[in-house]
Structures are given as C-alpha cells and as structure tokens.
Amino acid sequence: MSLPKAQILVVVTVGGSTNSAPILEICSILAARGHTIDFATLSGRQKLVDNYPFVKKVHIVGPAISAEEDEKHYILFSRWNWNTARGKRDIVKGKMAFDAFWPFTYRGLKEVITTTKPDFIFSDFHVEAALDVCNEFRLPHAVMWPQMPWLMMPQKYIPGQPGMQQRCLTSEHASIYDRLFEMTFLLRSAPFFLHWIFWTKAMRRKEGVAPRPRHSKPDYLVFMNNFYGMETPRDTPPLVHPVGPILADSYPALDGDIKSFVETHQKIALVAFGTHVILDDGKIFKIIDGLADAISSGVIDGVVWALSARSRGQLDTSIRVPSLHLSHLTIDQLFKNQDQAWHFATWVPQRSVLEHDSTIIFVTHAGPSSVNESIFHGVPMVAMGIFGDQMVTTLRLERSGVAVRLDKETFDAASLTTAIRTILLFDKESFQRNVKRMKRIAMVGSRKKHFAANVIEEHLYDWDGRFENSILDLKACSNRKRGFLQASNSKDMYPRGKELRPMHLQTPDVRMSWIKLNNIDVALLFFILLGIISWITRAAANMVRL
C-alpha cells in the first residue's frame, strides 16, 4: 500500500544558503519519495534553489533586499556586542531590519497558499509569518533552527537563553556570578528588547493579526541543524529533534590554482569568515600578522583565505602589509597571491579544502555551516564569533575541545599565533582526540536527515487524519474528478471539519490546566481528607474521655 503524496512549501526569506540548504537537503529525500516541493522566498533569492532541480516552482513573497541595504545591515551586525548600550541597540536594529519583511511575507504566503494549497510548510526560523499562516489555515508546520530555540523548553540547569549565553552553557561548573549574569541578561537588556516587542506588536496590529500565544513547548515540528556534543543535552518533547549536521552528499572539488596550492603544501590553515561577515581593516591586519608569525615559526606552511569582496572593499590595498614578515608587499600584491605561502580568493570549495590531508587548522567565524563542515571533516578550529549565534557557538566549540576561542574585540596577532600553536603543538594530543570523537559523532548525526524526512511524513499523516476530513484523500479524489474545492475564506480553504484528536507527538501537559498538571486538586483533596480524619479522630478522642 502506497502512502499519499503531499505538496510541501519551503519558505526561506531573509536567510541565505546556510538557512535554505539544510531544509532543501531534507526535501531532496521527500522529493525522492514522490512529494512535490515548492519554494517561497524574497525577490532576487531564487538562486538558492539552483542546485536543487527537484523544486517544482519558486514563489516570490516579498521585495528584494538591495545590495546596499544588505551591506549596511551586515556592517551593523559586525559591530555586535552584548555588553554595551550601543551594541544592544545595534542588535535590536538588526533584528528589526529582518522582521520588517514580515508584512510582505505574511501577505505573500497567504496568496501562495490560496492559489497552490500546499499540504505542509517547512520554514526557516527567521520566517515568523509562516507560523501565522499555518495557524490561520490549520496547516502542519516544521521549522529549522541552527540551535535550540530561545524562550522555549527552559531547563533549571541551563542559565540564560540559547544563543545569548556569554559565560557559561550550563550551571554544572559555573560560579554563582556567571549564573546570575546569564539569568539576568534579558532583564538588563529590557529597554532595548521592549522597544522591539512594542514595534512588533504595532506591526502585527496594523495587519490585523493577533499576537501568537507563547508556549513553553512548540506546537509544531522543530528541527535543529546541530547535534548533542555541540548542543547541551536537555529533555525535549517529541516535536523537537536535533538532526544535524545536515550536509550535502557531494560538494565542489578542488581545481585550478587552489588545487595546485593545496597539493604543494603540507600544513595549511584555512581562513574563512562566511559570506556575510564584513571584517574591518584592523581585524584583517591582525589575522594576517598572526598567521605570518605562525608560518615564520614553521607551525603552518601555507594559508588559504576566502576573503569576501565586501571585506576587501573596506581596505586601502595600496599600503604595505603591516607585518614584519610581509612588509615587502602591498595589500594588493598579497591579495594577488604574490607570496607563495598565501592564497587569497573570494570563494573556495571549503569542504574540499577541509577534507584534504594538508589542511590542519581552520580559522573561522563559527557560522553553523562552517562549524558543521569542519567537525565532519575532522579539522580543529580557532573560532572567533562576529555576530548572532556565532558568539555562543564558540563557547560550544571550546567546551567540546575542538577549538580555541578568541574574542573579536580583544584578540591580537600574538593571541592568534598562540591559539594555533596550542592546537598544533602544545595540546596536540588532546585536540586530536576530541576532533576524532566529534567527527565520528557528526558522521553518525549526518544520517539523521533521513530521520527528519520520516518525522515530517509522520506528522503530516497524523495531522491529516486527526480531523473529520482527510485533505490528502480529498485532493486525490478531486484530481481524479473535477479539481480541489475552492474557497474564499482562509478557514474554509482546507475543509478539514472538526478536530477529533490532538497531535500524536504533542505531550499532554501543554493542553492541561496548571491545576491538573501539578495535581493541585489531588493535593487539595488529600489535605481536606487529612483534615477530616484529624477532626474525626479528635472528636472520637473527646467522646472517649467523656
């Protein structure tokens, strides 16, 4: 007996390939099983599906982000700082710049759903509008996160919010000061976050959309492109699953100049800070100087640096390289690879470089994709987070024993050289052991994308069967006859009828009252009975005395 096939709509808007690739990798499995995959995004981002030919149709649900706006946004994010008023203000401004696309996305998604009638929505965690339309149309939904979601599933042993921790990831070995620091972060940052909350409420009110109720557990599927070993283990409900690292089965091979460079060196440091990070000249010069010192001391013999055009654009390339070992070159000459120990490019086939035996260390911004790839290919890291979840990822890497963490505000050339020497010389045995351990865990975890596809199908079929009418069956019948039912009202768009049972993966506690959940009524009854027994006992004792 074959299972019914569904139409799945993937939604990625302000996120890039780091956000879309894990979702589309899972969808490639679903497409192979016969499901139809559509993709919704902002104008100008259609290229996100270029490597995924199974995507049937691309829908535009919002305006393009101009190159100028995009650069301005990431320059703002590159100043990320949790500990200053200006830094917190910039963080909130960046979040609001992303969220400003919510009205366009909300209206665009409603139109796409009305015209195409998907059976399931699979969205990136940035797309708040997907949650709203799924609630409105009663659609099953999955969300992909790079880490545990914030403001959900709190644990007593985890202080603070995931993604916002700066000092400690758990309370296990943390001082009382560090625990208080993490636990009070939102309180100390309240003025900035309240501004965002009020702004968001006003934006939703303008569209006539009520605030979504906040739950301690999600009422939809949550996947994380991460794995335990990086993430702190915690109790999670059946709707939440770490399924990472999600990686493509194939990747671009080495060729041309980069292949020649890698094959003619034995101890290469790969340097890459991602597509969106914009490094200022001070940081770039300190990294160059630190790497030059490492080359001079013989710890490494070559550097492959994928330096984005945006970061290059911040530099005066006519000046001499501010390093004792490279002062005979200008920045422009160094970027043109006129020193045989250095290879610069705006893009390199990162996974192929990491997989090569010559690559022995990775200097990275600790972005989710880069970290997953580095662990999977067994390369230790010097991790320097620049913004967002990169900051806490460096803490996780340090705890896992596969990286030395540097602070973007305080590091210098000497600290970078020391970090490289620590990994490759001083603590080499410890790092090799931990890298091997994490690599093997990641290799097993990379198979979980098939499990994620299974869970999506399971949730889809449960959702379809827990109402009076099966939409998948109705669609199958209408396709054989005269077409699916048309409706102008969103509530009637999917004629499911009455809800007969709850989600089978949802734990019952979220549907229970606080009194029943905590057995307050049972405790109250117990104390009443205890009081009655005590009163009867006392009364009987008094009667005996008489």
UniProtKB/Swiss-Prot annotation:
Q: Which GO terms describe its cellular component?
A: membrane
Compartments in which it is found: Membrane
What the record says about the induction of its expression is: Expression is induced in the presence of 6mM glutamine.
Which positions carry the signal peptide feature in this UniProt record?
A: 1-20
EC nos: 2.4.1.-
Instruction: Name the species this protein comes from.
Output: Fusarium mangiferae
Q: How does it sit in the membrane?
A: Single-pass membrane protein
**Protein name in UniProt:** UDP-glycosyltransferase FPY2
